Amino acid sequence: MTAYRLTRRASLGLAAVPLLLPLARPARAQRLDRLVFQTDWRAQAEHGGYYQAVAAGLYRKAGIECEIRQGGPSLNIGQLLLTGRVDMTMSNSFEAFTYVREDAPFFTIGSIFQKDPQVLIGHPDTGFDGFEDLKGRTLLIGSGGRVTYWPYLRKKFGLRDEQLRPYTFNMAPFLADRNVVQQGFISSEPYSISKAIGRMPPYLLIADAGFSAYQTTIAISRKLAVEKRDLIQRFVDATLEGWAQYLKGGPATEAANALIKKANPEQTDDRIEYAIKVMNERGIVVSGDALQGGIGAMTDARWQGFYQSMVDVDVLPRGLDVARAYTLDFVNKGIGKPT
């Protein structure tokens, strides 16, 4: 795992393990193009559009047999892509630039999340209302966050490295000290903490500070994108339609959630319902570029702006060819655009 990877597993200091989601073959003899997509963590609502595309038959309608492999705490997803064991992975802006820096033959073809879903969570009734209120508090941030969004927040809000403490992947240190702020994901940790303290804690969405990373992106080899352009376009279109249906509660959403719960029994109906609700309310998927280009949209300007913001805080090196990190060929076609 590279220093610049910022996904759920990286923020926890973990890698990923492939857990296969078996998909039934169609009853009729039908030749389908097979693709393997690797997610960055265990099955959850934050991956719901992919499971919706399976449950609603969108991939099969597009002539694709899509195998979804869920992530977990063991293998390096980037290595799976590098060795050709998977066709595409769930990724992010940081990893795209890491591929450029290391001259690896991979790039980004779409971004499901317009807003990075990471949050900093405080305690109720402690004056924790904005990023300026981070000053003077103990911050539990993992290794991934320390080399990605932390330098950005530190510079913008005058914070200090002395405030940092290790994130131990459980709520106990946070619950024990009301002056502590901990990292999390908007669709998960605030919900878990609310169950422990009896009310929803205040939290700050890092994207609201101007941190403009694309998140939950689709990474692929340049070779596959060029040689099988039609196949990849069909995959992208079916995936984006899956996300549009999932967020609105399409007819196959219950079946999609059943697939999620089967793959990851830790997921419950109420947790999934909360995650979908907060993704919609906070515009995690449909906001920014997606308001005009549809779900998955990206722009040259945002890629360039994010890169420059990371250069300014010494997170990424100067001189990278930003255009090699991504292509706009497969997105910005209006799928899932608000009407």
Spans of features found by a protein language model:
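Short helix-capping segments at alpha-helix termini
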Residues: 58-61, 157-159, 196-198, 266-269, ...
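N-terminal signal peptide c-region/cleavage motif recognized by signal peptidases
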Residues: 24-26
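Conserved C-terminal helix/tail region of periplasmic/extracytoplasmic solute-binding proteins
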Residues: 300-339
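Short, glycine-/small- and polar/acidic-enriched structural segments
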Residues: 29-187, 205-206, 212
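Secondary-structure end/capping motifs
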Residues: 226-313
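Pocket-lining segment of extracytoplasmic ligand-binding domains
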Residues: 94-95, 169-266
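Short, surface-exposed acidic
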Residues: 159-164, 203, 264-280, 316-324
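N-terminal secretory signal peptides and thylakoid transit peptides that target proteins
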Residues: 2-18
